[in-house]
Design a protein with these regions (language model features):
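Glycine/proline-enriched, intrinsically flexible loops and inter-domain linkers
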Residues: 1-337
Length: 337
Protein backbone atom coordinates (compact mmCIF):
# COMPACT_ATOMS: atom_id res chain seq x y z
CA UNK A 1 0.00 0.00 0.00
CA UNK A 2 2.84 2.39 0.80
CA UNK A 3 4.40 1.87 -2.63
CA UNK A 4 1.05 2.42 -4.36
CA UNK A 5 0.58 5.68 -2.48
CA UNK A 6 4.12 6.76 -3.37
CA UNK A 7 4.08 5.88 -7.09
CA UNK A 8 0.39 5.58 -7.90
CA UNK A 9 -1.28 2.44 -9.23
CA UNK A 10 0.20 2.68 -12.73
CA UNK A 11 3.65 3.54 -11.42
CA UNK A 12 3.58 0.62 -9.00
CA UNK A 13 2.47 -1.85 -11.69
CA UNK A 14 5.16 -0.58 -14.05
CA UNK A 15 7.86 -1.04 -11.42
CA UNK A 16 6.59 -4.51 -10.54
CA UNK A 17 6.71 -5.50 -14.19
CA UNK A 18 10.25 -4.11 -14.47
CA UNK A 19 11.44 -6.21 -11.51
CA UNK A 20 9.94 -9.37 -12.98
CA UNK A 21 11.33 -8.59 -16.42
CA UNK A 22 14.81 -7.99 -14.99
CA UNK A 23 14.78 -11.40 -13.29
CA UNK A 24 13.55 -13.10 -16.46
CA UNK A 25 16.17 -11.47 -18.67
CA UNK A 26 18.91 -12.22 -16.14
CA UNK A 27 18.22 -15.95 -15.89
CA UNK A 28 17.85 -16.28 -19.67
CA UNK A 29 21.25 -14.66 -20.16
CA UNK A 30 22.79 -16.81 -17.42
CA UNK A 31 21.52 -19.97 -19.13
CA UNK A 32 22.55 -18.90 -22.64
CA UNK A 33 26.19 -20.17 -22.51
CA UNK A 34 24.91 -23.67 -21.70
CA UNK A 35 22.27 -23.93 -24.43
CA UNK A 36 22.02 -27.43 -25.84
CA UNK A 37 23.54 -29.16 -22.81
CA UNK A 38 21.70 -31.94 -21.03
CA UNK A 39 22.47 -34.23 -18.09
CA UNK A 40 20.72 -36.93 -16.11
CA UNK A 41 21.20 -37.67 -12.41
CA UNK A 42 19.82 -40.03 -9.82
CA UNK A 43 20.13 -40.28 -6.05
CA UNK A 44 18.79 -42.66 -3.44
CA UNK A 45 17.36 -41.73 -0.06
CA UNK A 46 16.42 -43.96 2.87
CA UNK A 47 12.88 -45.08 3.58
CA UNK A 48 13.21 -47.37 6.63
CA UNK A 49 9.62 -46.52 7.54
CA UNK A 50 7.33 -48.36 5.10
CA UNK A 51 10.12 -50.36 3.46
CA UNK A 52 13.79 -51.25 3.81
CA UNK A 53 14.26 -50.41 0.13
CA UNK A 54 15.67 -46.92 -0.57
CA UNK A 55 13.74 -44.47 -2.73
CA UNK A 56 15.00 -43.20 -6.07
CA UNK A 57 14.82 -39.63 -7.33
CA UNK A 58 15.74 -39.07 -10.97
CA UNK A 59 15.94 -35.98 -13.16
CA UNK A 60 17.05 -35.01 -16.64
CA UNK A 61 17.95 -31.35 -17.02
CA UNK A 62 18.04 -29.78 -20.49
CA UNK A 63 19.08 -26.21 -21.29
CA UNK A 64 17.24 -24.63 -24.21
CA UNK A 65 17.19 -21.12 -25.65
CA UNK A 66 17.16 -19.22 -22.37
CA UNK A 67 15.13 -21.97 -20.72
CA UNK A 68 15.73 -24.90 -18.41
CA UNK A 69 13.63 -28.06 -18.33
CA UNK A 70 13.86 -30.54 -15.43
CA UNK A 71 12.09 -33.83 -16.13
CA UNK A 72 11.70 -36.03 -13.04
CA UNK A 73 10.44 -39.07 -14.96
CA UNK A 74 11.88 -42.18 -13.34
CA UNK A 75 11.36 -40.95 -9.79
CA UNK A 76 9.91 -43.46 -7.33
CA UNK A 77 6.15 -43.84 -6.91
CA UNK A 78 4.66 -42.37 -3.75
CA UNK A 79 4.97 -44.53 -0.64
CA UNK A 80 2.93 -45.33 2.45
CA UNK A 81 4.97 -43.06 4.71
CA UNK A 82 5.38 -39.39 5.53
CA UNK A 83 8.31 -38.91 3.12
CA UNK A 84 6.09 -37.96 0.18
CA UNK A 85 6.79 -34.41 -0.99
CA UNK A 86 3.89 -32.07 -1.92
CA UNK A 87 4.23 -30.64 -5.38
CA UNK A 88 4.59 -27.06 -4.08
CA UNK A 89 7.67 -28.06 -2.09
CA UNK A 90 9.07 -29.90 -5.10
CA UNK A 91 8.69 -26.83 -7.30
CA UNK A 92 10.23 -24.58 -4.65
CA UNK A 93 13.35 -26.71 -4.19
CA UNK A 94 13.87 -27.32 -7.91
CA UNK A 95 13.75 -23.57 -8.51
CA UNK A 96 16.11 -23.01 -5.59
CA UNK A 97 18.68 -25.39 -7.11
CA UNK A 98 18.62 -23.55 -10.43
CA UNK A 99 18.93 -20.19 -8.71
CA UNK A 100 21.83 -21.41 -6.53
CA UNK A 101 23.85 -22.29 -9.63
CA UNK A 102 22.91 -19.66 -12.20
CA UNK A 103 21.59 -16.63 -10.29
CA UNK A 104 22.56 -16.77 -6.60
CA UNK A 105 22.44 -12.99 -6.17
CA UNK A 106 19.11 -12.46 -7.93
CA UNK A 107 15.50 -12.38 -6.76
CA UNK A 108 13.55 -15.62 -6.98
CA UNK A 109 10.23 -14.48 -8.42
CA UNK A 110 7.79 -15.22 -11.22
CA UNK A 111 10.04 -13.57 -13.79
CA UNK A 112 12.78 -16.05 -12.87
CA UNK A 113 10.31 -18.93 -12.75
CA UNK A 114 9.06 -18.32 -16.30
CA UNK A 115 12.34 -19.66 -17.67
CA UNK A 116 11.97 -23.00 -15.87
CA UNK A 117 9.75 -25.93 -16.88
CA UNK A 118 9.26 -28.94 -14.63
CA UNK A 119 7.89 -32.38 -15.52
CA UNK A 120 6.61 -33.97 -12.30
CA UNK A 121 5.14 -37.48 -12.70
CA UNK A 122 1.78 -37.90 -11.02
CA UNK A 123 1.46 -40.31 -8.09
CA UNK A 124 5.19 -40.07 -7.52
CA UNK A 125 7.23 -39.34 -4.42
CA UNK A 126 7.49 -35.69 -5.52
CA UNK A 127 3.91 -35.24 -6.78
CA UNK A 128 1.77 -37.57 -4.67
CA UNK A 129 -1.94 -38.14 -5.07
CA UNK A 130 -4.09 -37.12 -2.11
CA UNK A 131 -4.56 -38.46 0.46
CA UNK A 132 -0.82 -38.89 1.00
CA UNK A 133 1.25 -38.65 4.17
CA UNK A 134 3.69 -35.71 3.89
CA UNK A 135 4.75 -34.92 7.46
CA UNK A 136 8.45 -35.56 6.72
CA UNK A 137 8.43 -33.91 3.31
CA UNK A 138 11.49 -31.81 4.21
CA UNK A 139 13.69 -34.90 3.87
CA UNK A 140 12.52 -35.48 0.31
CA UNK A 141 12.40 -31.83 -0.73
CA UNK A 142 16.07 -31.59 0.25
CA UNK A 143 16.69 -34.53 -2.06
CA UNK A 144 14.89 -32.71 -4.90
CA UNK A 145 17.43 -29.91 -4.66
CA UNK A 146 20.25 -32.44 -4.36
CA UNK A 147 19.39 -34.39 -7.51
CA UNK A 148 18.93 -31.22 -9.60
CA UNK A 149 22.28 -29.91 -8.35
CA UNK A 150 23.88 -33.25 -9.25
CA UNK A 151 22.68 -32.85 -12.84
CA UNK A 152 23.78 -29.21 -12.98
CA UNK A 153 27.26 -30.18 -11.79
CA UNK A 154 27.63 -31.94 -15.14
CA UNK A 155 26.26 -29.01 -17.14
CA UNK A 156 27.91 -26.05 -15.39
CA UNK A 157 30.71 -27.50 -13.25
CA UNK A 158 32.43 -24.18 -12.54
CA UNK A 159 29.25 -22.82 -10.94
CA UNK A 160 28.22 -25.94 -9.03
CA UNK A 161 29.13 -27.87 -5.91
CA UNK A 162 29.52 -31.51 -4.98
CA UNK A 163 26.86 -33.21 -2.87
CA UNK A 164 26.03 -31.64 0.49
CA UNK A 165 24.60 -33.13 3.63
CA UNK A 166 20.84 -33.47 3.47
CA UNK A 167 20.94 -35.91 6.38
CA UNK A 168 18.82 -33.65 8.65
CA UNK A 169 19.50 -35.63 11.86
CA UNK A 170 16.80 -34.87 14.38
CA UNK A 171 15.16 -36.44 17.39
CA UNK A 172 12.52 -35.86 20.01
CA UNK A 173 12.77 -37.24 23.52
CA UNK A 174 10.22 -37.12 26.29
CA UNK A 175 8.83 -38.58 29.47
CA UNK A 176 8.68 -37.61 33.12
CA UNK A 177 11.44 -35.78 34.92
CA UNK A 178 11.75 -37.76 38.14
CA UNK A 179 14.81 -36.03 39.58
CA UNK A 180 12.95 -33.84 42.06
CA UNK A 181 10.55 -34.67 44.93
CA UNK A 182 6.85 -34.43 44.27
CA UNK A 183 4.83 -35.20 41.18
CA UNK A 184 7.11 -35.85 38.16
CA UNK A 185 7.01 -33.13 35.50
CA UNK A 186 6.33 -34.14 31.89
CA UNK A 187 8.69 -32.75 29.26
CA UNK A 188 9.55 -33.04 25.57
CA UNK A 189 12.70 -31.73 23.91
CA UNK A 190 14.78 -32.38 20.80
CA UNK A 191 17.44 -31.10 18.45
CA UNK A 192 18.46 -30.84 14.78
CA UNK A 193 21.99 -30.91 13.37
CA UNK A 194 23.61 -29.29 10.36
CA UNK A 195 26.53 -30.92 8.56
CA UNK A 196 29.03 -30.54 5.73
CA UNK A 197 28.46 -28.62 2.51
CA UNK A 198 29.83 -29.94 -0.75
CA UNK A 199 32.97 -28.39 -2.20
CA UNK A 200 33.12 -26.46 -5.46
CA UNK A 201 35.94 -26.02 -7.92
CA UNK A 202 38.55 -24.00 -6.04
CA UNK A 203 36.53 -23.71 -2.83
CA UNK A 204 36.22 -26.05 0.13
CA UNK A 205 32.81 -26.90 1.52
CA UNK A 206 31.61 -25.13 4.65
CA UNK A 207 31.52 -27.15 7.86
CA UNK A 208 28.68 -27.56 10.33
CA UNK A 209 25.96 -25.73 8.39
CA UNK A 210 22.40 -26.31 7.26
CA UNK A 211 22.15 -26.76 3.50
CA UNK A 212 19.58 -26.03 0.81
CA UNK A 213 16.05 -25.69 2.18
CA UNK A 214 16.92 -26.10 5.85
CA UNK A 215 17.42 -23.13 8.16
CA UNK A 216 17.58 -24.68 11.63
CA UNK A 217 20.10 -23.87 14.34
CA UNK A 218 21.60 -26.03 17.05
CA UNK A 219 19.74 -25.72 20.32
CA UNK A 220 21.87 -24.28 23.09
CA UNK A 221 23.06 -26.97 25.48
CA UNK A 222 22.06 -24.77 28.40
CA UNK A 223 18.53 -24.35 27.03
CA UNK A 224 18.17 -28.09 26.53
CA UNK A 225 19.25 -28.78 30.11
CA UNK A 226 16.72 -26.22 31.37
CA UNK A 227 13.97 -27.91 29.35
CA UNK A 228 14.33 -31.39 30.81
CA UNK A 229 16.61 -34.16 32.08
CA UNK A 230 18.88 -34.30 29.03
CA UNK A 231 22.46 -33.02 29.12
CA UNK A 232 24.51 -32.07 26.06
CA UNK A 233 27.79 -33.82 26.80
CA UNK A 234 29.66 -32.56 23.75
CA UNK A 235 29.42 -31.03 20.29
CA UNK A 236 32.18 -31.32 17.71
CA UNK A 237 33.08 -31.20 14.05
CA UNK A 238 33.94 -34.74 12.94
CA UNK A 239 37.55 -34.93 11.65
CA UNK A 240 37.86 -36.53 8.23
CA UNK A 241 34.11 -36.54 7.55
CA UNK A 242 34.38 -34.24 4.52
CA UNK A 243 35.05 -35.98 1.22
CA UNK A 244 38.65 -35.83 0.04
CA UNK A 245 39.47 -33.75 -3.00
CA UNK A 246 41.43 -30.93 -4.53
CA UNK A 247 38.75 -28.98 -2.68
CA UNK A 248 37.53 -31.00 0.34
CA UNK A 249 33.97 -31.23 1.56
CA UNK A 250 32.79 -29.61 4.78
CA UNK A 251 32.82 -31.44 8.09
CA UNK A 252 29.88 -33.10 9.81
CA UNK A 253 28.62 -32.34 13.32
CA UNK A 254 28.42 -34.91 16.11
CA UNK A 255 26.51 -34.23 19.30
CA UNK A 256 26.18 -36.42 22.39
CA UNK A 257 23.19 -36.30 24.76
CA UNK A 258 23.06 -37.97 28.18
CA UNK A 259 19.78 -38.92 29.84
CA UNK A 260 19.52 -37.93 33.51
CA UNK A 261 16.42 -39.88 34.56
CA UNK A 262 14.74 -43.22 33.84
CA UNK A 263 11.85 -44.16 31.60
CA UNK A 264 12.32 -41.80 28.65
CA UNK A 265 11.40 -42.50 25.03
CA UNK A 266 13.26 -41.19 21.98
CA UNK A 267 12.21 -41.11 18.31
CA UNK A 268 13.88 -39.50 15.33
CA UNK A 269 15.14 -39.73 11.80
CA UNK A 270 18.03 -38.91 9.53
CA UNK A 271 19.19 -39.64 5.99
CA UNK A 272 22.46 -40.42 4.17
CA UNK A 273 23.37 -43.32 6.47
CA UNK A 274 24.29 -45.84 3.75
CA UNK A 275 27.13 -46.03 1.23
CA UNK A 276 24.63 -45.63 -1.63
CA UNK A 277 23.01 -42.51 -0.13
CA UNK A 278 26.00 -40.44 1.06
CA UNK A 279 26.86 -37.05 -0.51
CA UNK A 280 28.35 -37.53 -3.98
CA UNK A 281 31.74 -36.28 -5.12
CA UNK A 282 32.49 -34.56 -8.44
CA UNK A 283 35.39 -35.00 -10.86
CA UNK A 284 37.17 -37.54 -8.68
CA UNK A 285 36.27 -35.99 -5.34
CA UNK A 286 35.45 -38.32 -2.46
CA UNK A 287 32.02 -38.90 -1.00
CA UNK A 288 31.07 -37.35 2.31
CA UNK A 289 31.08 -39.59 5.37
CA UNK A 290 27.69 -41.09 6.26
CA UNK A 291 25.38 -39.88 8.99
CA UNK A 292 24.77 -42.14 11.97
CA UNK A 293 22.85 -42.50 15.21
CA UNK A 294 23.46 -44.87 18.10
CA UNK A 295 22.96 -45.31 21.83
CA UNK A 296 25.65 -46.22 24.32
CA UNK A 297 24.02 -47.81 27.34
CA UNK A 298 25.04 -46.89 30.88
CA UNK A 299 25.57 -50.55 31.66
CA UNK A 300 27.80 -51.06 28.62
CA UNK A 301 27.18 -51.87 24.99
CA UNK A 302 26.47 -49.84 21.87
CA UNK A 303 23.14 -50.01 20.02
CA UNK A 304 23.06 -48.71 16.41
CA UNK A 305 19.72 -47.33 15.24
CA UNK A 306 18.19 -47.29 11.76
CA UNK A 307 17.50 -44.04 9.94
CA UNK A 308 13.90 -43.91 11.24
CA UNK A 309 13.62 -44.94 14.89
CA UNK A 310 10.47 -44.78 17.00
CA UNK A 311 9.85 -45.30 20.70
CA UNK A 312 13.33 -46.36 21.79
CA UNK A 313 13.65 -46.57 25.58
CA UNK A 314 16.41 -44.67 27.38
CA UNK A 315 17.32 -44.60 31.06
CA UNK A 316 19.60 -42.65 33.34
CA UNK A 317 23.20 -42.64 32.12
CA UNK A 318 22.37 -43.74 28.57
CA UNK A 319 23.89 -41.57 25.85
CA UNK A 320 22.49 -40.78 22.40
CA UNK A 321 25.08 -40.08 19.69
CA UNK A 322 23.79 -38.12 16.68
CA UNK A 323 26.04 -37.46 13.68
CA UNK A 324 25.29 -35.73 10.38
CA UNK A 325 26.86 -36.42 6.99
CA UNK A 326 29.97 -34.69 5.70
CA UNK A 327 30.04 -32.75 2.43
CA UNK A 328 31.58 -34.33 -0.66
CA UNK A 329 34.86 -33.30 -2.27
CA UNK A 330 35.63 -31.80 -5.68
CA UNK A 331 38.45 -33.04 -7.89
CA UNK A 332 41.19 -35.57 -7.22
CA UNK A 333 43.05 -34.87 -4.00
CA UNK A 334 46.39 -34.94 -5.84
CA UNK A 335 45.38 -32.12 -8.20
CA UNK A 336 44.93 -28.40 -7.71
CA UNK A 337 41.30 -27.33 -7.47
Amino acid sequence: AELVRKYGTEGFLARKAAVLNHSHVYIRQALAPYQGRSARAEILIEDDAASAEPMRLAVEVTIGDGTLKADFTGTEAQRANGLNCPVASTISMAHYAVQAVFAPDQLLNDGFNRAIALVLPKDSLINPRAPAAVSCRHLTEQAVADVVLKALAQIAPDLSTAGSQISFPTFGIGGFDQRRPGEPRYFVTGDILGGGMGAGRGRAGASGVDCHGSNCALISGEIMEMTGPVRVVGTRLVPGSGGAGAAPGGLAIERVYEVLTDGLTVSGYLQQTRPETVPWGVDGGGAGAPAAVWIERAGGGSEPLVSKFIGVSMNRGDRLFLRSAGGAGWGHATLDA
